[in-house]
Amino acid sequence: MKKDFKLNVNFPWGKYFKENKIIYKILLILVVFMVLLFNSTHIIAELQWFQEVGYTRTYLTRALAVAGLTLPIFLIFFTISILYYKSIAKKYDLVAYPKKTPKEIKTRNRFVYIAAGIFFLIVSYGLARDNWYIILQYFNSVDFMEVDPIFMKDISFYVFRLPFYQLLISMSLSVVVLLIVLTVFIYLGIAAKSSINRLNFRNLQGILHVIKSGFIQFAGKALAMLIALYMLLLALKYYMDAYLLMFNESGVVYGPGFTDVRVHMPFLRAMAVLAALSSLVVAYGILKRKVKFIAYPVVLIFALGLVRVFVGLGVEALVVNPNQLERERMYIANNITMTRQAFGIDNVDIRIFEANQDISPQEIRANQHVVDSIKVNSYRHTLDFIKQAQVIRGYYDFNDVDVDRYMIHGEKKQVFLSAREIDHKAITPATWQNIHLFYTHGYGVIMSDPSTVTSQGQPDFLMKDIPVTNTTDIPLDNPRIYFGEMVSDYVIVGTETEEFDHPKGGENETYRYTGDAGISLGFFNKLLYAIEEKEPKILISSLINEDSKIIRRRNVVARVKAIAPFLSYDEDPYLVIANGQVYWMIDAYTITNRYPNARTFGGINYIANSVKVTVDAYNGDV
């Protein structure tokens, strides 16, 4: 017979939880332990990796920046909240729970302190982790020595300092709003537990009575302080919003136009002044329980905001649009000048070359080296042919073709280059041992001459095959590729099993890694990376010994991004052969979308190719 489930409201829940308190404490300790374990293993693994690549200082700078920012943010948030809670909790207890014992109040306060501490620690860490670079930029900013055409401020103000001010204002507003909401909820709790106020919201008089006799009486001073602070922060926000018009995209130009400069900027400054003055008026109204002093400033700011919108629309329609080119001429010129300046094309030397179709045989003979280097092959078609002719085994692949120039037999020639990498997705069977211990690296480089073809009309290979057949005088002593564009998984070298090196006829040549890359796998590190990689085989496999090393972050772009995340990288590294080794070269850029008055392309409006990065394909050195 089916029975309906009913909750036993008479069950002694309090006694049950009290008797089983030790179980919940153990569960809480286990949860905290697991969280700390996984976070600490990640931190240690990251630190070891940065030590391996020689960039410990970079990691520590970031880690110390996050930790150094988390602490003050936490202390500010936590201290303000707890002090405010203490000031308001006394009234709450007197009215809502007059019979509560000091012990009960102490227990509740302890819970509030712990909960608030955990909450604000998580929030503070999140803010520090997501904004550490903004804060470091602010404290390490350098002037551009160039100014914007409207406010005449150095460009560094917009790139480095304005984001920091916005962050401070945003965080402060969030805390103040949180405290105001907390005050309202505490008051509603009191109103529900006592006769201080019956919450009559049926008419305007009832609402005014609730505000004047209940809410303000309960939290008048605290609320006055919070509202005043909120209005001051709002004033700062309006003041900073005027600078944000330098990034306005709604007009005919990127940045401020006629209406922005003549209407929106003055209105925003007026609203900032009004909000600052209103902070005092609203605070006075709360303390004196005069609702009109609270309402009028708020209504006035809102009304001024509406007037700004309608005046802006009117000026745009009646003043600008009928004579747009004349009105916007200066601002269009500003936009063009700042865009050229931002992208470094303001001093371009323009030269006109007249094309001459009448080329004589004498001119051809005089420029034979130019004619000989004319490309007859496309890199796309060359890649297709390489994949057909040079993959050799199904577990190899070529990601792309790069173009470079080399001195070959005393002559500078343009060449196509492509690296033969291991494709882990194509390995069969895809066992853990095959992917991480056996198939550890690619092998060889294909070099072709784009200006010639074979007698069959195919690309002319200068380097090809396994082992590498090299018809150039460019030495390639080590063709092994442990770091590349296609790889992403970790590998473990120096194990009890030999690594696959390359096929040789019907057999496989094996190899043991002799480079410097990798982190030694003693017992502690085996346990550490078993947790970090979520792979218990790292700990229990009998193939891993004390001489084994784990090599991580083998994708060259991911590798350099981890070292310097504040740069933007070209996603297409190009291959270089030098000193008998294979290297990857990556262009790195400093970018921003905060260059004032400059048009954006692809989400940015400033770029500089400030850094060239090389990665050793064998050792992973950066």
Language-model features, listed with the residues they occupy:
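Soluble extracytoplasmic regions of secretory-pathway and membrane proteins
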Residues: 3-20, 26-29, 33-622
